[in-house]
């Protein structure tokens, strides 16, 4: 981007991603675990709040990047380790946290947790028509800043009323999990008014949970929508107040 916007700067970009391995320590005891292996970073909530980053030593490995973020909705840290030391850090985390009940968790478990929390996957729950105000990110955008690259487009997005809106959806029958990409239709005309973008059965709630892109006319909480399933049947579902089905206040990840 800088090479096209400021060609006179002669910017060169070196990809560093391949030199780092990311390990996600998540759960109510994740801070306890990292405190045993990190001695040069204060992990207390006040010193290291949610959505912040530090650089420190983990399991004796220097220059690790520690983010207090995560995709699970729980207290969580992403630890980015120089790849040559990744196996050492991984094995040390498991051994050190044995009495805490530490265990590996897979991508499918992460995807269920993120959906319960309402975290969306870019490119699955969003698309080319998704904009900050319709994807639940309106509070992160400051339109009163001095002119910046992309500001006219952002302002235009806030003025539009025809863009699809990302919402949380709950099937009225909690045991039905609509297939992802199931169409949301007008019950009388079959006009397509949206689609289910993510869906899973929630072990936490014992029911299905979904995210969906819907026409603005259906985006208000409490609105009943019609979902067309792959077998041709239709089910009613209700638009929820939040994207998050679990802990919408974010209390778990901010402790």
Regions flagged by a language model, labelled:
Residues 1-255:
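Conserved, structured C-terminal
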